[in-house]
Amino acid sequence: MNLLENINSRPLPLAQLMGITFTHAEPDKVIARMVVRPDLCTLGHTIHGGSAMAFADTTGGAATLINLPADAKGATAIESKTNFVGAAKEGSTVIATAVPLHRGRRTQVWQTRLETEEGRLVALVTQTQLIL
């Protein structure tokens, strides 16, 4: 089973609920896509900050899982910081790209860029995962 199949074979209820699709997975990069549906938007018809954060958290979490040390039982986020830079309109597709900043035995730090299909930055998220 390759890394993308590994991620896609896991039960990820929030990812399924939000319509997140993982399209690429390697140790140094995980990419996912999500259509900005009306139920994921603000009253102004742009992606809600909570939806953006959940999308980034899900992508960074998946990246952590495929990079766990062999003796790890799992991981949990212990810190997350989001810089909101731009908007993504209802109906558009947002792409999340997670790359590692640090991969240690006890913690991993991932940075996830959320961009529109046109390449406009929506948010930049940095999260720290505690390895269990």
Locations of regions flagged by a protein language model:
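Terminal targeting signals and extreme-terminal segments of soluble enzymes
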Residues: 1-132
